[in-house]
Amino acid sequence: MSKNNSLKVLLAGAECAPFVKLGGLADVMGTLPKELNQIGADARVIMPFHSQMKGKYGAQTKHRADFNINFAGGETYVGVEELFYNDVTYYLIDNEGFFGDAVYRGGLAEGEQYAFFCRAVIEAASRIGFIPDVIHCNDWQTGLIPILLRTQYGHWDIGNAKTIFTIHNMMYQGEFGFDQFEHWLGIDPKYDTPEFMHNYECASFMKAALVFADRLSTVSPTYAQEIRDPAFAYRQEGILNARAGDTWGILNGMNQEEFNPETDPLIPYHFNKDDLSGKKKDKIELIKNLGLSITPGVPIIGMVTRLTEQKGLDLVK
């Protein structure tokens, strides 16, 4: 299939490996586009041009566009830089005022940061001429893209794009008073209802995505089932159960090039399924590095995770 006839997919997210990585989202954003391209899609990434990237990758970018968008009652600058890296095209949204410091500012400042990003994504794609068939939105920071497309950009060339919203973690939803969404993006107050964006005491990026995205997905089939239960839905069980037929649980894959024990430069001894002797030696080296006593036959268990209750730390004894 030629690229001209390929399914055009634009993946939007706050972080992407190897450029900026604070969590598992970055791994998905950094590997999924390449895999999609290998099966015939034309998949590209759009993300903020964080200050952490500019020193190492800034010289490799090509300027594609600059324009102003309507944001928070005024006109706000957007620059678009293009980076081709590891066979994938990346579009980087540049604005020092929003992406010149922390990737996630926290609180109201983070809401403003990513409300800006959501509008910038839509207008940038249109202005540079990459009109996707599908916009793949990841986590709450991109959650306003579907509602903006549906309610404010229907007359634009990008207005017919379908959206899929992937839930990486239900716990974080981008909750703010609806007046902020109205101020930032001019979202109509009629959407400040439980049917649309409102959930209990506030509105949220996440609720908007759950209602307005054409399809929903999660990081595993099990998680897709779990989040319909009030214990794991974080007060979104109503809409998640209503949209169960539109929700797909797709198991996150593993980057077998990076995480390959036969070639991984970060482990002292290599091994494979036919010869596990190197794995035993790696275990001994790890025990030494941790200052633990070496006791044959006793397993050592490691967790690569945030130190939060949600990750099951209570199960580690």
Task: Report each predicted region and the residues it spans.
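Catalytic cores of nucleotide-sugar-dependent glycosyltransferases that transfer UDP/GDP/TDP-activated
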Residues: M1-K317
